[in-house]
Regions:
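Catalytic machinery of carbohydrate-active enzymes
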Residues: 1-150
Length: 150
């Protein structure tokens, strides 16, 4: 949901942990942390405010141990992320990836967006909140989960 690069021009790419509430409230889903910087406070907030546990592997160095992060991504059914390193890794290992993306100019999106068979992009315009993006992703997760159960 955020990057190690929080320069002002990069901030529109990232969501707050509260913005992810529609996804986090999806029933019958186990959540695994792939966030690589400053996540402890956010995970506590999710637990305290939403009553949802996001599992974190304390022995995994999310920032420096890319091989283990890739292996973890490979073991997951799907990944939800904003435009950080995470979706590049998850899609790269073949895991279905839902990308919450800030829609910029068409050329910028064509040149810098992830693309491929394992990426589903959900976009928001510059002045729009993230609500619709994460609600749409939550609906997609429910469809995916229902399909796997049947």
């Amino acid at each position: 949901w955020k990057s190690s690069n929080l320069a002002p021009e990069r901030l529109p790419h990232y969501a707050t942990i509260s913005d992810l509430s529609p996804v986090l409230r999806t029933p019958n889903v186990t959540f695994i942390n792939l966030q690589y910087v400053s996540f402890e406070e956010d995970l506590n907030k999710i637990s305290n405010e939403l009553g949802i546990e996001v599992h974190n592997f304390d022995d995994l160095d999310h920032y420096n141990d890319i091989d283990d992060v890739a292996a973890l991504c490979l073991s997951l059914d799907l990944v939800v992320s904003t435009k950080t390193t995470v979706p590049f890794i998850s899609a790269g290992v073949g895991t279905s990836t839902k990308l919450a993306n800030w829609k910029q100019s068409p050329w910028n999106n064509v040149l810098s967006n992830l693309n491929g068979p394992k990426i589903d992009v959900f976009e928001r315009d510059t002045l729009d909140p993230w609500d619709n993006v994460f609600t749409s992703i939550a609906h997609d997760i429910l469809k995916y989960a229902n399909k796997r159960r049947s």
